[in-house]
Design a protein with these regions (language model features):
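C-terminal catalytic domain of Rieske-type non-heme iron oxygenases
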Residues: 1-177
C-alpha cells in the first residue's frame, strides 16, 4: 500500500483499524525487496517504524498466477488468481478467508458491495463495472478533494487501471491456452 491506496485504506471496512496501517500511512515510499524462491517470489515492502526498526509486509507470489496478501490485524487474508483466457486477457479471481473463524456477515456484505479487493460487476457478467472502456469511472472531483489519489474507487480497480493501461506485454503466441 502506497500513495495510491492510502485514502482507501482509511475507510475500507476490510482494511481500516489494523495497527499496521499506521506504518503504511506514515511511510508512503516503502523500500521493496524481491527474493526468488522455489515456486515463485517473495515481495517485501519495508517501512520505517519506531526507534530504528522496520515494519515489513511480505507478499508471496506463487508461480504462475497466485498471490496471498498479508493480513491486517484480525481482518481476513486475501489474494488473487490471474487465469489466462486467451492470448491477451486473463480473468482475475479474488478471495478472502480467515484461518480461525468464519467470515462475519459484515465482511461478506462488504465483499459483495465490492469493497476490499473485490469489485462490483456489470450485471449478468464477470466484467468489472469500473473498466478500461469507461476510464474506471474516474472521478476527478473526488481526486481534487483527496478522497482517492487517482480518482478511481477501490483497491482492485486502482491496481487494474495501472496494470491494464500497459496493454498486453507478454508474447503468448507460443503457448497453448
Amino acid at each position: 500500500v502506497s500513495f495510491l491506496h492510502g485514502a482507501t485504506m482509511k475507510k475500507d471496512p476490510l482494511f481500516k483499524g489494523a495497527a499496521g496501517n499506521k506504518y503504511n500511512l506514515r511511510d508512503r515510499k516503502p523500500a521493496f525487496e524481491v527474493k526468488q524462491v522455489d515456486g515463485g517470489l517473495l515481495i517485501g515492502a519495508r517501512r520505517n517504524a519506531e526507534n530504528d526498526h522496520y515494519y515489513w509486509r511480505v507478499t508471496p507470489f506463487v508461480a504462475p498466477c497466485f498471490t496471498v496478501i498479508p493480513p491486517r490485524g484480525d481482518h481476513p487474508i486475501h489474494g488473487h488468481f490471474w487465469i489466462p483466457i486467451d492470448d491477451h486477457n486473463c480473468m482475475a479471481w479474488s478471495y478472502d478467508y480467515h484461518p480461525v473463524r468464519a467470515l462475519s456477515s459484515a465482511e461478506r456484505e462488504a465483499m459483495e458491495r465490492g469493497e476490499g479487493i473485490h469489485v462490483p460487476y456489470v450485471p449478468g457478467t464477470f466484467r468489472p463495472l469500473q473498466n478500461k472502456d469507461n476510464d474506471y469511472l474516474m472521478d476527478r472531483e473526488a481526486q481534487r478533494r483527496g478522497d482517492t489519489y487517482s480518482g478511481i474507487e477501490g483497491f482492485a480497480m486502482q491496481d487494474a487501471s495501472v496494470q491494464e493501461s500497459m496493454g498486453p506485454i507478454v508474447d503468448r503466441t507460443k503457448e497453448n491456452l
